[in-house]
Amino acid sequence: MEATNQNLDSVLKKLRKLQNLYEGAKKINSEGEANAAAAAIQRLLTQYNLSMDEIGTDEEKAKDTVFEEKVDGFTYKSIGGEWEFRLLYVLCKWNFCKCFQVGSTYRRLMIFGKKENIETVKWLRGMLAERFVAFSKNRFKEYKKTMEYAMKPISMDKYQRSYLMGCAAGLDAKLKEESDREKAKNAEFRAKVTALVVRNDAAVTEYIE
C-alpha cells in the first residue's frame, strides 16, 4: 500500500465506491462478510490518511483538523444494552478516531477525529448495526430450536444484547488481524502507520484537552 503513489481524490473515490457497493447493506449476508467489508473500508481509510499526511497540500492539511460530534448510543431501544457504544468504540479505535461516553451513560456518545474519519466511522456504524441486528433476529430463531433454549429459555432482547456484544468483539479481532497483516507485509509501511497513529492520537488528545 504505497500512499505516495496515490492521489487523494483517487483514494477518496475508491472509498466512496466501496461504500456505495455496500449501501443498503442487504448484500452483506453474514457476520464474516460484514467484518470483511469493515476491513476493506479500514484499508482505504488508512491509505487516505497516509496520503494526506505525506502528499496533501498545506491547504488540505489545514482543513484536515480534529472535530467532535455527539451521537446517539441508544438507537435500537427495543434491544438496549451497551453494544452500540462497544461497536462505535471498536470502529473508532481502528479508524483514527476516539469515542467516549458523555457523563456516565452509554446512551450519549462523543466522537473525536478528523472529518473524513468521523464520517466513515458513522457510516460503518450505521451499516454494521443494521446488519448485525438483522443477523441477531435470525440467530435467535435458530437458537429457539436448540435444547439449550428448551432447558433455559431467555428473552429475545437479552439474547440479542449478548450476540451483538459478540459481534463487536469479533469485529475488533478482525480489524486487528487485518491491521497486523498489512503491517507485516512491509516494514516501511508499518513504520509509517505507527507514526501516523501516534501523531493522530496526539492531535485528538490535544483537541480534547
Which residues does each predicted region cover?
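Contiguous, well-ordered alpha-helical segments that form the cores/surfaces of helical PPI scaffolds
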Residues: 39-43, 89
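Non-transmembrane amphipathic alpha-helical segments
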Residues: 11-25, 44
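Inter-helical turn/loop segments and adjacent helix faces that build the functional surface
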Residues: 27-29
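Short arginine-rich
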Residues: 43-51
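Short, charged, amphipathic alpha-helical segments
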Residues: 31-39
